[in-house]
Amino acid sequence: MMLLICALLLAGCNEKAPAQAAAAVTETPETAAPETAAPTDVPTPTPTVEVVEIVLTPAPTAAPTDTPEPTDTPTPTDTPVPTATPTPDCLHGGDHPDVFQTGEPVKTETSYVSENVCITIQRIEDPEGFPKPMVCFVADIYIEDITSLRSAWSKDTLRDSANAPGDVLDLMAREDALLMINGDYVSKWNFGCVVKNGQVARQVDNPRYDACVLLRDGTLLTLDGDKTSSEQILAMDPWQAWCFGPALLDENGHAKETFNSSLIGPNPRTVLGYYAPGHYCFVVVEGRRDKYSKGMNLQQLSRFMESLGCTAAYNMDGGDSSVLAFDGQRVSKPRSRRSVPDVIYICEPRKEK
């Protein structure tokens, strides 16, 4: 009996054990289901692959498109501008700064150099290609200011000067001149356009003689008298205007062969030569002395002025009136010391009233 009860109890225990085990198995899938669902969401990292595509490097390629800006900086082309602006008072635009010097003027027997004026006088004897004997003087002149090249009457007016010519050395001292030549003797005539130091002395048309005009910017012009009226000359607002001539060089600076003048034979000569604004020359040729200097005719004189490199040249009064004076002394030795009614001279700049 006891054995039967034990067997029944043992059988009941065995039936409960599989039931509990089955219950345990059925419960574990229920708890694992929510935990295994989470890993199925992990595929979200796949967008990170697309993020890599965003790292397309268009930004660096856009940067070079901004770099052309340096090509828009051609500022170096503006640097030449300062060199193109000469000082207003400099007639030759600063092309010859080496001919002047600062400080006190330096003077020798044949030269004068200051901050505003440079004069060098050369004596030329028997120039090649010209009759012998021949003596001439060339005064090379640079000025910074147009007021350094002036004219003067022997007296206060043109009319008074015609009746009372003066000695060149007296006029040099009166005008405080550095260098002086005789002028055009215009007081002898009653025609021609005459301007001295900006002041009009006469306004009469002159078809017979060439005119010479010095403008305020330093330019010197020689004009045909039969093609230029006094009104046209005065319209230029000249600093000086002379009436004698003839012009010795053509518009290209070459020697003329024909002249509107009766005084074409060998004679003492006085010439105003021109190179460029601010650069001029006074030329005096000795003459009428066979054993010293015969003088030049107009063809020879024009060739001589061309040989000096002048671009324009104008014949002034000549003969015994021709004279060159420097530093209070006559440089040329004219046959006679004829008085002159007007002169052309170089001085230090002056302020005009």
Locations of the language-model features?
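Short acidic-glycine loop/turn motifs at beta-strand connectors
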Residues: Y142-D145, L214-L220, E251-N252, Y274-G278, ...
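Sec-dependent signal peptide recognition
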Residues: M1-L3
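Active-site-adjacent helix-turn-beta-strand microarchitecture at beta-sheet edges
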Residues: L91-H92, H96-D98, K107-S111, T120, ...
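Ser/Thr-rich, Proline-interspersed low-complexity disordered segments
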Residues: E15-D89, T102
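Structural recognition of the beta-strand scaffold that forms the well-ordered cores
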Residues: L178-N182, C212-L214, G273, C281-V283, ...
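Conserved, well-ordered active-site substructure
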Residues: W189-P207, E257-T311, S321-K353
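Zymogen propeptides
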Residues: E15-P18, P86-N206
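C-terminal motif of bacterial Sec signal peptides marking the signal peptidase cleavage site
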Residues: L9-G12
